[in-house]
């Protein structure tokens, strides 16, 4: 390893060490820039403002500098939610860059408002984008503010951006092959996929859908379905797209949760999209929205309790309190209606609008009648299989029996019902239901059976022993197909289990297991074909004839199995039945003494059994267990969705009569047929004006009804959205709890409040100078208290340099002594003192006042020290804690006993580069002088004449208490 760093390892003194260094070093910040960013971090408004002002004059600070984390001052202010410093930085034209995106990600609403209202000043020089490190940006180029806000799902920020009329790129179709999609995918496929994912992630935001969509429920339906289909195409991001699809489904369900009355629920579920092609625009109150939800597989929406409550009310219409009745009463009621279904059907045929005719149209009654009709059909199939009517078994073309004649109307009724369903719903919707495919297979088998029986009846008239019939005799094939159709007819009854809460989940689990079996069969057939081909190739040469076998029997069905692998078909059968243990091992033996061939054959046969039984069969069991567990975890939702589909099939108009009564033409059917024939072949001579008026009237009525329905729907949606947003914000605040961000905000608030208090006490901010006492009165009070000290203060002056351009303040130490104040002075001295600068006595009073506030009131024997630049009271023995222990004790005592005369202070540059070693230098630059209460003496010197007037009385009181018994000593260093 050391050879990677040194060429000559043997002669290296550090050959047993690996040297480390920073290979990707970044530009280090200067002390001023570090102090500037530190002030922004702590919320020190005054220091930040001073640094910005100095940067405009001296260019000693890069206001767009970044810390090691890549955060500029503006981003730090956004992270700390310090809007005052943000506004200050924006007023000084800092580089904004991705600040808006950063504020959106941090969900700082105030910062977003401030940045949206920010306008770059005209004529100002802005930092060009190319000068910034674009590769270090945390956001990809395709991310826009509205997309990022939608990703965070912050309702307030999304609302602010939508009010600015922002836009989102419209995603192309899933399998779009346009020039733009093809070229984008070829240039950078990762960026193309990521960009599509970011767009859909933004579009799937519940807050964005609630704000910008006229029909948020329908938008969630379509978007969820599109995302589900997209997950099948974009396999790399399948989990992300499925999560977004589930998010859309939950949003639609949560929106429906906010419905508070049956009226609102009916308006939502009966609303129809005018642009929808799959629904008839002439029908109203047909649960159109619920049909769309079923079409898009919105299981959560359909299984929502409010929706199920309305469906149950419609389903049990005419049977109030049905669920509260005893199960015996329910059973007797259903059996009674079931036995009466022929009479109810005949009553409907004769008079559809009578009481009995309207009674059978109720969904629950219709369901019972159809179930009773199907059970009757199964009973007749049972009678047909038992051969109650005896016939000659050796007749090649037997005529139909009485039971078969009774079965025929039911078969025709089933076929007619399937034709009507395919005509009403369309072929695509018809084949999407697996039960329809099963019905199609069952009806096809019945038709084939009837056709073959007719052929046998016409072609074969004689009687012949059945053992002598050929293998493909029509009667034999018809009997086989009829047996298969009987099995399918009996299994079709499982679909009715969905109506029961106990059998429904089991029926759904069975359907999922069938899918697992199909997946398993695909792999199993591949293994079966592979071993069948190998074994057939090995044993093909050892095939024997039937006459050479016992009892002239050849194959695995013989008493002694033989020739199990002689042909490919026989090999496939043998391997299949071996899974169930029905094949013996001696089938791998051959009559010749070819032991190697027998060994290879037995090994291949054993390997097949290990793979099929141990591996594949256990894999199938695991898959079926997983499918059952998946249904069991969501049993309630899956069952309610399946039950709703069953109920909806009986809510629709049509299909009222069960088989076989549905094939009987009703008077209503004759009326409809007559009207169609009359309008088609015998049109009446009607003036064009009358026809146009009729069309205009009907169009106006439909349009008015549509407008009224849409207005009611929009009112309900508006209320639902308001309730949803309120609940979302309330839940987010409840679930959030105390996080690390809350403690950071609290820390920042405390820090900002601290500096605000310091500014208030130190009067560092210009806007807060609202004082009442005049400077003349303050000077008079000061001269009165100072006594003869004021005369000495006239000859002394101190200069402060505000613009320290280097890291250390250059200039000699300004240390002076000031005796204790004596008695009151005369009027002339007061007048002369009022003409002087007010800052000297005021600063002296403030120094004493701050020391009093800080709790550093020293005992008479101690000698306290005060540094105005730091505002921290320090004892002389504390110098060792701040790395000045090397100072001599005598110099330290001299420094502690020295005083400064602050009667006259002038603004200007401190001339001279010599620096004193007697007193420690407390600050290295103007940015580092804001560490405590009086953080910046330069800020104090910038104050106007009225700054210190409000502190006059408090300072006088402290001066009297302080002056009794000890000498005032103040030490300052700049």
Curated annotation (Swiss-Prot):
<feature type="topological domain" description="Extracellular">
    <location>
        <begin position="455"/>
        <end position="476"/>
    </location>
</feature>
<keyword id="KW-1003">Cell membrane</keyword>
<feature type="transmembrane region" description="Helical; Name=S2">
    <location>
        <begin position="405"/>
        <end position="419"/>
    </location>
</feature>
<feature type="glycosylation site" description="N-linked (GlcNAc...) asparagine">
    <location>
        <position position="461"/>
    </location>
</feature>
<feature type="binding site">
    <location>
        <position position="436"/>
    </location>
    <ligand>
        <name>Ca(2+)</name>
    </ligand>
</feature>
<dbReference type="InterPro" id="IPR002110">
    <property type="entry name" value="Ankyrin_rpt"/>
</dbReference>
<feature type="repeat" description="ANK 2">
    <location>
        <begin position="69"/>
        <end position="97"/>
    </location>
</feature>
<dbReference type="GO" id="GO:0005886">
    <property type="term" value="C:plasma membrane"/>
</dbReference>
<dbReference type="Pfam" id="PF00520">
    <property type="entry name" value="Ion_trans"/>
</dbReference>
<keyword id="KW-0479">Metal-binding</keyword>
<feature type="binding site">
    <location>
        <position position="418"/>
    </location>
    <ligand>
        <name>Ca(2+)</name>
    </ligand>
</feature>
<keyword id="KW-0040">ANK repeat</keyword>
<dbReference type="GO" id="GO:0015279">
    <property type="term" value="F:store-operated calcium channel activity"/>
</dbReference>
<feature type="binding site">
    <location>
        <position position="172"/>
    </location>
    <ligand>
        <name>Zn(2+)</name>
    </ligand>
</feature>
<keyword id="KW-0812">Transmembrane</keyword>
<keyword id="KW-0325">Glycoprotein</keyword>
<feature type="transmembrane region" description="Helical; Name=S1">
    <location>
        <begin position="364"/>
        <end position="384"/>
    </location>
</feature>
<dbReference type="InterPro" id="IPR005461">
    <property type="entry name" value="TRPC5_channel"/>
</dbReference>
<keyword id="KW-0109">Calcium transport</keyword>
<dbReference type="InterPro" id="IPR002153">
    <property type="entry name" value="TRPC_channel"/>
</dbReference>
<dbReference type="GO" id="GO:0070782">
    <property type="term" value="P:phosphatidylserine exposure on apoptotic cell surface"/>
</dbReference>
<dbReference type="GO" id="GO:0005262">
    <property type="term" value="F:calcium channel activity"/>
</dbReference>
<feature type="repeat" description="ANK 1">
    <location>
        <begin position="30"/>
        <end position="60"/>
    </location>
</feature>
<dbReference type="GO" id="GO:0051402">
    <property type="term" value="P:neuron apoptotic process"/>
</dbReference>
<feature type="transmembrane region" description="Helical; Name=S3">
    <location>
        <begin position="434"/>
        <end position="454"/>
    </location>
</feature>
<feature type="binding site">
    <location>
        <position position="439"/>
    </location>
    <ligand>
        <name>Ca(2+)</name>
    </ligand>
</feature>
<keyword id="KW-1133">Transmembrane helix</keyword>
<keyword id="KW-0106">Calcium</keyword>
<feature type="repeat" description="ANK 4">
    <location>
        <begin position="141"/>
        <end position="170"/>
    </location>
</feature>
<feature type="region of interest" description="Disordered">
    <location>
        <begin position="811"/>
        <end position="838"/>
    </location>
</feature>
<feature type="topological domain" description="Cytoplasmic">
    <location>
        <begin position="625"/>
        <end position="974"/>
    </location>
</feature>
<dbReference type="Pfam" id="PF08344">
    <property type="entry name" value="TRP_2"/>
</dbReference>
<keyword id="KW-0862">Zinc</keyword>
<keyword id="KW-0407">Ion channel</keyword>
<feature type="topological domain" description="Extracellular">
    <location>
        <begin position="536"/>
        <end position="603"/>
    </location>
</feature>
<dbReference type="GO" id="GO:0098793">
    <property type="term" value="C:presynapse"/>
</dbReference>
<feature type="intramembrane region" description="Discontinuously helical; Name=Pre-S1">
    <location>
        <begin position="326"/>
        <end position="360"/>
    </location>
</feature>
<dbReference type="InterPro" id="IPR013555">
    <property type="entry name" value="TRP_dom"/>
</dbReference>
<feature type="region of interest" description="Disordered">
    <location>
        <begin position="766"/>
        <end position="795"/>
    </location>
</feature>
<comment type="similarity">
    <text>Belongs to the transient receptor (TC 1.A.4) family. STrpC subfamily. TRPC5 sub-subfamily.</text>
</comment>
<keyword id="KW-0472">Membrane</keyword>
<dbReference type="InterPro" id="IPR005821">
    <property type="entry name" value="Ion_trans_dom"/>
</dbReference>
